[in-house]
Amino acid sequence: MKSFGLIALAICGVICVAAEPQHTYDGRNGPHVFGSPGNQVYIRGQNEGTYSVPGVGGQFQNAPQRGEHVYTDEAGNTFVNRKNAGGPASHTISGPNFSAKNLGPNGAKSVGIPQRARRSPQFHVERPGRTVDVGNGGFYIQRGRRSPQLHVARPDRTVTIGNGGVYIQRSRRSPQFHVERPDRTVDFGNGGFSAQRFRRGINDARVQGENFVARDDQAGIWDNNVSVWKRPDGRTVTIDRNGHTIVSGRGRPAQHY
């Protein structure tokens, strides 16, 4: 019975060892630097062969036989770190976007970046009245010829200035002068002046009764003893039956006449 238990325990141990998953690099076991062209690339993981890192796109490959650790990102760029047994480590970056090599302290460093298209040595600026061209031979300015004619126009005259001098042309004014007001018009011309007054309508602003009258901003009222008139300037004029006048209002003391 005891031997059966030992056998069962051994079988379970073998199964557990076989079922233990392969460790993957999670960033806690060493540097994980990719960088930009010219910066050090150093990758280290636990697994041998190809593996992936959770949360990081691309693929890793650890090749201890070659002493290389390779990372290829999602864009196809490859970062290689070489241990170089017996010497300093080196790294290489290559891909569609850039390339760089660092062969160690004793080696030269080269960086290759896609070359930018060569710019034209010609620089051209254009304005309405001139053009400027700058190149290897210096700069060239070309000014367009301005018109010698200057023209100014007003409602009753025009002024033209050119090579021949100044020319002013005044249009003839009408001999008729016209003034119009709500209740009248006045026309003045060669034949004299004519004034025309219009009859006020029954809907005029004036209101009048037996003992009062009001129009716009003034009004008056009266009886047998006194009459009171409110003037447009805000003053009040009072006249009694004996002809005495009192003017008051607008913050001034009453004035007796």
Curated annotation (Swiss-Prot):
Provide the propeptide boundaries. 20-21, 118-121, 145-148, 172-175, 199-204
Q: Which residues carry this modification: Pyrrolidone carboxylic acid?
A: Q22, Q122, Q149, Q176
The signal peptide stretch is 1-19
User: Which residue ranges are recorded for the region named Disordered?
Assistant: 95-122
GO-annotated biological processes: antifungal innate immune response; defense response; humoral immune response; killing of cells of another organism; response to bacterium
The protein's PTM annotation reads: Proteolytically cleaved.
Any one Gene Ontology cellular component term annotated for this protein = extracellular space
Which key words tag this protein in UniProt?
Antimicrobial, Cleavage on pair of basic residues, Fungicide, Glycoprotein, Immunity, Innate immunity, Pyrrolidone carboxylic acid, Secreted, Signal
Tell me the function of this protein: Secreted immune-induced peptides induced by Toll signaling. Has a significant role in resistance to infection by the entomopathogenic fungus B.bassiana R444 and weak antifungal activity against M.rileyi PHP1705. In adult males, activity appears to be important for neuromuscular processes that mediate correct wing posture upon Toll activation.
**Protein name in the entry:** Baramicin A2
Tell me what organism the protein belongs to: Drosophila melanogaster
